[in-house]
C-alpha cells in the first residue's frame, strides 16, 4: 500500500524463526517472509531487513544466523540469555534502512505480551521503544477469541507500551462485519484504542512462511498430472514448488504417510534443515522403501538440496555439524554421489543451464544454501552448469530417471516449468506441455500482492495510519 502511494518502503523484522530462507545477491541468508515483503514493496531483498534468523534444527535448538552469516547452534535457553548482545546489530540494521528508505515497516514476532519473555526484548515492544515507532496491534479472528486476544494484550502491556499503540486491527474476518460492531465499540471502550478496520479473509495465494497445513495440505490431485512432494519432518524451502501448484495441469500433494502416496507421475524430495534425521525418518516410516518401489516402476524422482543429499549413497557428518554428534548414514542409493558435511555454509545466487537429458538446455535461476559438499562418482552426469561472477562449475547429478541438485527456486521461471512438463511429466501421460500456458510466476505474484493491497486498503483507515506515523 505504501509503495503504491509512492513511498520507498523497506520491511524489517529484527529476529525471525523460520525454516524457509533465501540468499541475497551478495550471498547473505535471510528469512523468506521479509523477501516476500520486499518483493511486494518493489525493492531488492536485503539482509538488513532480517538481521537475525533462527533456523530450528531440533525441538530445543536452532542455527543462529546474524547479518546473513552462521554464528552457530544454540539451545533456546542459551539464546534467550545471550540475545541482548545482538541489540546493537539490530539497531544498526534498522538505522541504515531508515536512512535509505522513506518508511520502514516493522513486523513483530508472536505476541508482544508474553510476559515470561519480555526481558531484553529485541523484536516487539522493546524494539518499538528503541526506535520510537508507533504500533498497530492485529488480532486473527479466524482462530477465534479475537476480543480476548486484543484486550488481554493491551491489559498486559506496561503503560508506556500501551501509549505506543496507534490502533487495533481485526484480521481474517469471514461474514457480515456489521455483526461485529457492538463488540468493536465495547473493545474501544475497554482499551481506549480505536479499531482501524476489519480486514476480510482474502482469497490470495502468497507464499506461506513456514506452515504447510492451512494451504498446501488441502491441495488434491484432481488434475492431469499427479506430483508428490515428500513432507519431511524438517522440510524447508517448500516455496520451491509454489510455481508448480499454480499450473493448471498439475496437482501437487504434500505426503507424509506412505498410504497416501499412490502412484504419482513425479516425486519431489525437498530441502530439509536436518538431512540426517529426515533420512532416518524416511527409513523408519517406510517412505524409503516406497520411494524405491516407485523408482523401480519408472517414476521420476527429483531431490533438491537436502533431498539431493539423501538420494546419494552416503551422508557423513564427521564433525557433528547438524546435530552436534558425529554420524554416518547410508543414503537411498539412487544417485552415485557422496555427501560430507562441513562447518562452512554455501550461499550463492548462480545462473545455470541444465546439462543432462531430458532437461538439457533449460535455463535456470535460483540460489544455493546448504552445509556440506557432494562428490560425484567417476562418470556420473552432472545436472546443471553454473556460472556466478565469472566462475563456472557443475552441480547436481542424474542417473536414469533420478535427478538431484542444490539449487533452490529452479521452478520460478516459466521456461523451466515448461521444460519440466515436456521432458518428464508429459512423456508419462502423453499430454502436450502446451495444453495449458504457464504464467510467469513473478507476474502471478504481483497480481496476488495487488489483490491483497486492494482488500486491505478498502478495509482499513489508511489515513489514520499515516497520521500515526506523522506522514
Predicted regions, residues:
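Conserved catalytic-site region of short-chain dehydrogenase/reductase
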Residues: 310
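Flexible phosphate-sensing "switch/lid" loops adjacent to ATP/NTP-binding sites
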Residues: 1-293, 297-300, 317-320, 343-344, ...
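Conserved P-loop NTPase catalytic core
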Residues: 321-348, 354
Amino acid at each position: 500500500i505504501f509503495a503504491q502511494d509512492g513511498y520507498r518502503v523497506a520491511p524489517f523484522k529484527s529476529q525471525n524463526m523460520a525454516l524457509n530462507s533465501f540468499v541475497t545477491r551478495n550471498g547473505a541468508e535471510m528469512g523468506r517472509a521479509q523477501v516476500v515483503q520486499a518483493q511486494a514493496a518493489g525493492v531488492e531483498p536485503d539482509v538488513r531487513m532480517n538481521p537475525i534468523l533462527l533456523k530450528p534444527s531440533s525441538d530445543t535448538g536452532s542455527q543462529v544466523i546474524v547479518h546473513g552469516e552462521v554464528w552457530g547452534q544454540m539451545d533456546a535457553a542459551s539464546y534467550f540469555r545471550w540475545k541482548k548482545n545482538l541489540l546493537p546489530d539490530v539497531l544498526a540494521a534498522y538505522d541504515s534502512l531508515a536512512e535509505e528508505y522513506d518508511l520502514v515497516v516493522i513486523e513483530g514476532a508472536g505476541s508482544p505480551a508474553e510476559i515470561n519473555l519480555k526481558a531484553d526484548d529485541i523484536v516487539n515492544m522493546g524494539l518499538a521503544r528503541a526506535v520510537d515507532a508507533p504500533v498497530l496491534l492485529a488480532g486473527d479472528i479466524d482462530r477465534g477469541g479475537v476480543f480476548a486476544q486484543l484486550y488481554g494484550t493491551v491489559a498486559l502491556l506496561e503503560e508506556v507500551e500501551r501509549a505506543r499503540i496507534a490502533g487495533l486491527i481485526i484480521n481474517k474476518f469471514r461474514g457480515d462485519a456489521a455483526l461485529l460492531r457492538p463488540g468493536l465499540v465495547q473493545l474501544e471502550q475497554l482499551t481506549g484504542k480505536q479499531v482501524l478496520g476489519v480486514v476480510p479473509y482474502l482469497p490470495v495465494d502468497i507464499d506461506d512462511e513456514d506452515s504447510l497445513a492451512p494451504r498446501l495440505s488441502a491441495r488434491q490431485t484432481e488434475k492431469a498430472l499427479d506430483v508428490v512432494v515428500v513432507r519431511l519432518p524438517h522440510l524447508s524451502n517448500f516455496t520451491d514448488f509454489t510455481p508448480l501448484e499454480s499450473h493448471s495441469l498439475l496437482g501437487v500433494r504434500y505426503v507424509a504417510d506412505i498410504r497416501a502416496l499412490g502412484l504419482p507421475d513425479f516425486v519431489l524430495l525437498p530441502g530439509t534443515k536436518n538431512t540426517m534425521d529426515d533420512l532416518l525418518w524416511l527409513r523408519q516410516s517406510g517412505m524409503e522403501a516406497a520411494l524405491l518401489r516407485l523408482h523401480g516402476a519408472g517414476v521420476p524422482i527429483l531431490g533438491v538440496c537436502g533431498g539431493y543429499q539423501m538420494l546419494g549413497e552416503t551422508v557423513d557428518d564427521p564433525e557433528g555439524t547438524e546435530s552436534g554428534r558425529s554420524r554416518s548414514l547410508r543414503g537411498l542409493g539412487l544417485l552415485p554421489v557422496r555427501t560430507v558435511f562441513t562447518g562452512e555454509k554455501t550461499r550463492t545466487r548462480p545462473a545455470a543451464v541444465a546439462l543432462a537429458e531430458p532437461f538439457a538446455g533449460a535455463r535456470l535461476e535460483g540460489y544455493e544454501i546448504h552445509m556440506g559438499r557432494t562428490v560425484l562418482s567417476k562418470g556420473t552426469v552432472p545436472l546443471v552448469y553454473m556460472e556466478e561472477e565469472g566462475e563456472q562449475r557443475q552441480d547436481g547429478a542424474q542417473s536414469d530417471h533420478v535427478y538431484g541438485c542444490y539449487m533452490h527456486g529452479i521452478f520460478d521461471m516459466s521456461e523451466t516449468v515448461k521444460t519440466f512438463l515436456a521432458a518428464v511429466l508429459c512423456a508419462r501421460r502423453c499430454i502436450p506441455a502446451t495444453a495449458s500456458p504457464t504464467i510467469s510466476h513473478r507476474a502471478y505474484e504481483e497480481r496476488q500482492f495487488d489483490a491483497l493491497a486492494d482488500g486491505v486498503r478498502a478495509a482499513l483507515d489508511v489515513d489514520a495510519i499515516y497520521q500515526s506515523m506523522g506522514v
